[in-house]
Every structure is written in C-alpha cells, then in structure tokens.
C-alpha cells in the first residue's frame, strides 16, 4: 500500500469528514478508497464492450395503461441480460421491481433506459459493477 498526500479545501474536507462519520469509516483513508473505487468502477462500466453486472430498480404503476405488458415485453426482448427479478407490491397501485442483470454494459444501459423511459415508471436507478477477473 502506498501513502499519498492530497490537498483539500476546508469545505470539501468537512464534507468528507461528515460522510466518513455517517457511514462509519474509521478514518479518512478508508472513505477515500471506497469513493475512489466507486468512481473507477463507474468509469469502467461506461466503456462499450465491458462485461459486468447491474441492478436496475424502479417503481411503476401496475394499472397504468399497458405499462406492465410493455415492461414485460422489454424484459423478454433483453432476456439474455436478466439473471433474476424481484417484484414487490408496495401498495394497491405501485410495484417495485428489482432486476439483476449481467452482460455487456452498453446493452445493460440500453435496457435500463428503455424501462426507465416508460410513462408511469418512477425512481429508476441503475447501479453497475464491472466484472472483475
């Protein structure tokens, strides 16, 4: 492990210290390592051709005009990406769906964009992880 020195302005250091405390890090180095790993992983998933895993989560109104069938159609069109799906009934009108995906990150992003762009889908979020060799 290498020791490096960085310079941060006071406001940024205070923000880092607050984040470290909220997340329970023992020291700044642990927090900075995790932040850096996250940024590097996100960057790696932006490269077309990169293989990886992702979690797509979203809320949708199950009775919205044909929305459920459009989402299922999109899922079947990208069936090669889907590893597993969890479906939760939040209330009478809304469902939470969580899909674990695996494959080319460009294809995963395209699938996520197709789902999230559907009218009636809310709170869409894609978390990508590059495949580690």
From Swiss-Prot:
SUPFAM superfamilies: ACT-like, Ribbon-helix-helix. InterPro entries: Acetolactate_synth/TF_NikR_C, ACT-like_dom_sf, Arc_rbn_hlx_hlx, CopG, CopG/NikR_regulator, Ni_resp_reg_NikR, Nickel_NikR_proteobac, Ribbon_hlx_hlx. One of its GO terms (molecular function) is DNA-binding transcription factor activity. The keyword Manganese does not apply. Ni(2+) binds at residues 76, 87, 89, 95. It comes from the Bacteria. Keywords: DNA-binding, Metal-binding, Nickel, Repressor, Transcription, Transcription regulation. GO terms for biological process: response to nickel cation. Its cofactor is Ni(2+). Binds 1 nickel ion per subunit. Gene3D superfamilies: ACT-like. Chain A, domain 2 (3.30.70.1150), Met repressor-like (1.10.1220.10). Homotetramer. PANTHER family: NICKEL-RESPONSIVE REGULATOR. NCBIfam families: nikR, PRK02967.1, PRK04460.1. Transcriptional repressor of the nikABCDE operon. Is active in the presence of excessive concentrations of intracellular nickel. Belongs to the transcriptional regulatory CopG/NikR family. This is Nickel-responsive regulator. It comes from Salmonella paratyphi A (strain AKU_12601).
């Amino acid at each position: 492990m290498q020791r490096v020195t960085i310079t941060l302005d006071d406001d940024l250091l205070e923000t880092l210290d607050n984040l470290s405390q909220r997340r329970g890090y023992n020291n700044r180095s642990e927090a900075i390592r995790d932040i850096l790993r996250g940024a590097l992983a996100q960057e790696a998933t932006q490269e077309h051709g990169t293989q990886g895993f992702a979690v797509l989560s979203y809320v949708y109104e199950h009775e919205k005009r044909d929305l459920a069938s459009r989402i299922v159609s999109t899922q079947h069109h990208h069936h090669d990406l889907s590893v597993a799906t969890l479906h939760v009934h939040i209330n009478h009108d809304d469902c939470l769906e969580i899909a674990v995906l695996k494959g080319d990150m460009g294809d995963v992003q395209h699938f996520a964009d197709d789902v999230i762009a559907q009218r009636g889908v809310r709170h869409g979020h894609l978390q990508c992880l590059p495949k580690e060799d």
